[in-house]
Amino acid sequence: MSTALLDAVVKKNRVRLIPFMLALYVLAFLDRSNIGFAKQTYQIDTGLSNEAYALGAGIFFVVYAFLGVPANLLMRKLGARTWIGTTTLLWGFLSAAMAWADTEAKFLIVRTLLRAAEAGFFPGMIYLTSQWFPQRNRASIMGLFYMGAPLALTLGSPLSGALLEMHGFMGHPGWFWMFVIEGLLAVGAGVFTFFWLDDTPEQARFLSKQEKTLLINQLASEEQQKVTSRLSDALRNGRVWQLAIIYLTIQVAVYGLIFFLPTQVAALLGTKVGFTASVVTAIPWVAALFGTWLIPRYSDKTGERRNVAALTLLAAGIGIGLSGLLSPVMAIVALCVAAIGFIAVQPVFWTMPTQLLSGTALAAGIGFVNLFGAVGGFIAPILRVKAETLFASDAAGLLTLAAVAVIGSLIIFTLRVNRTVAQTDVAHH
């Protein structure tokens, strides 16, 4: 009876929270990656150099690295609704402000402020998931959330491409309208957050008293099985550092490809970045949608975290590397494999810290791991450009990213993860 009721509660939470979280992630990812679509014409119009573009794409992550931990602790203190709603409003306005960043200095300043506003969003979403869903459901729940990335790049690619075609409307370039319109969408979502989100299950307006009690008791029982709830213990735990390094390698693969993908696809097609290239750019993200649905569900069903994550990241590395060596059609196929790999690995990966940590340690630990991811995002475009310049080859940059992803997969294989927890949970499903 309690198992059936708990499943019903999880379903209610999923219906209430996942579409909301997914929509926010779509907007966040779109605002974060739309600079890739603007790159070609934006650089021509503003005179922005390749080095400044790479620095701007990378510096976006520096502030994030420093603010991730305190942002998550602030969310724990202030409440999810206030924190997520406020930060979403801020990043929406700042994303729109990119439309007026027509010099290198303005570009770097706005990108830095935008990342500061976004710093608490993603780790906050991971923490929010741990407060609303039992351990046995988290990979598939995170998989649904992570579909926001391929959705943003599937729907957002044609959207961004179409907005770029507005060049000349009211005397402004296409990238101006892309930044303004996509930024204001996030502003609207921030306002909606204040009316929709509850801070904790105890405050949930859509759950009965019995449902709240059952969920709270289930989550409390899982907390008792975790290694630590203190931040100091978390930072002394070797597995936390392993997770942080792994996440760095994942983000190198992700952002080393995403920031340059529209340009890479346009080069494969022999055209400029516009609507046609943007539609083709969406193909890998359509593939990633299916992978992000299936792979985390398989992980939840089997209770297998480590091997699923390692093999998925390995596939991403192989796909990235081959995309620079094959014919245009096969290169698109390789990019599909890469996108499936580096998107689908992340929801499986994030079950590991939520299985290991609890309380304040979990909030700060997620921020700590995400800090390393921010470092990965910072160095990724710089690493790719440096490799391309050093070897005078676009393929060299892709092979460098691939090598980092393969190293990450090998580290995952060495990680000790308590598979029994997931298996036990599945057995009770």
Swiss-Prot record:
InterPro entries: MFS, MFS_dom, MFS_trans_sf. Gene3D superfamilies: MFS general substrate transporter like domains. It comes from Escherichia coli (strain K12). This is Inner membrane transport protein RhmT. Residues 38-54, 103-143, 196-242, 296-324, 383-394 are periplasmic. Its main location: membrane. Keywords: Cell inner membrane, Cell membrane, Membrane, Transmembrane, Transmembrane helix, Transport. The lineage of its organism: Bacteria, Pseudomonadati, Pseudomonadota, Gammaproteobacteria, Enterobacterales. The keyword Acetylation does not apply. The gene is rhmT. It is a multi-pass membrane protein. CDD domains: MFS_ExuT_GudP_like. Part of the rhmRDTA operon involved in L-rhamnonate utilization. It is found in: Cell inner membrane.
